[in-house]
Every structure is written in C-alpha cells, then in structure tokens.
C-alpha cells in the first residue's frame, strides 16, 4: 500500500458574534414571560386592560421594528433570506427581537381577552395580519432594493 498524502489544513472562521450578558437575559426572559402569563390568564375585562394591551402591543411592535431595522442595516447590500437567519448576525441573541415579538403577541392576547367582544376572531385576524406584515414587508423592501442595485 502506498502512503496517504498529507491533508491540507482547514481554516474555520472564528465566531465573532458578541455574547449577550447573562444578567440581561435573566431580567428579560422572566419579565416577558410574566407579561405573557398575565395576558393569557387574566379573566378581568374593561377599558383599562384594553388600553394596557394596546400599549403592550405598541411597545412590542416598536421593539421588534427596531430589531428588524438594525438587522437590515447590518445586512445592507446583501439579500436577507426569508426563511433562514441573516448572513450578517453580530450577536448570538437579539434581545430586541426576543422581547419584541412576545410583547406584541401578549398585547394582542390581552386586548382580545379584555375587550370581551362577541367576535374575537376579527381582532385576532387583524393582529395576526399586523404581525405578518411587520415581519415580511421590511425584508421584501430591503431585498428589492438590493436586487435593483445588483442589477444596475
């Protein structure tokens, strides 16, 4: 038998993403979970809780929009895949996204439960459409702009 040729060295890219401090995750996750548990388990109704639900929804939507905007800015000039992670992801956990979407959902759940309406599916469908649009529209616009600059 002939001796095997030596293998070429393989270089692997170093993980340069920053780690999220543990104390931030230890504060964020129980807080968001508590808000969601309150929204899902409350049986009270009234205008005060509806307003609180709308405020939580607005905070979640704006937090998630900030996360989405930052992600698109970090990936400027690069197309972002719709069903996968972005090519440039400088952090392991994006706390804005980790708080934004659960708060958005919690606000929608609390608003629907506290309104005590006869047709909750109308509100639910509006909130679901808003959530889907909040996720997809900025990515579609970003990818169309990147495609235009690539073809020009």
Q: Each predicted region: which residue ranges?
A:
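Select subsegments of transmembrane alpha-helices in polytopic membrane proteins
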Residues: 19-30, 89-103
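Alpha-helical transmembrane segments and their membrane-interface junctions
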Residues: 34-45, 98-131
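Alpha-helical transmembrane segments and their immediate juxtamembrane interface regions
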Residues: 62, 124-152
């Amino acid at each position: 038998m002939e001796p095997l040729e030596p293998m070429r060295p393989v270089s692997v890219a170093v993980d340069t993403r920053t780690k999220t401090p543990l104390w931030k995750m230890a504060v964020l996750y129980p807080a968001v979970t508590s808000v969601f548990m309150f929204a899902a388990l409350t049986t009270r109704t009234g205008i005060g809780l509806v307003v609180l639900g709308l405020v939580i929804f607005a905070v979640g939507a704006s937090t998630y929009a900030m996360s989405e905007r930052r992600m698109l800015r970090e990936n400027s000039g690069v197309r972002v895949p719709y069903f996968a992670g972005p090519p440039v992801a400088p952090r392991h956990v994006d706390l804005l996204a980790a708080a934004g979407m659960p708060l958005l959902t919690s606000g929608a759940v609390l608003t629907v439960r506290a309104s005590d309406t006869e047709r909750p599916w109308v509100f639910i469908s509006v909130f679901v459409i808003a959530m889907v649009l909040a996720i997809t529209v900025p990515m579609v616009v970003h990818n169309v702009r990147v495609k235009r600059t690539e073809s020009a």
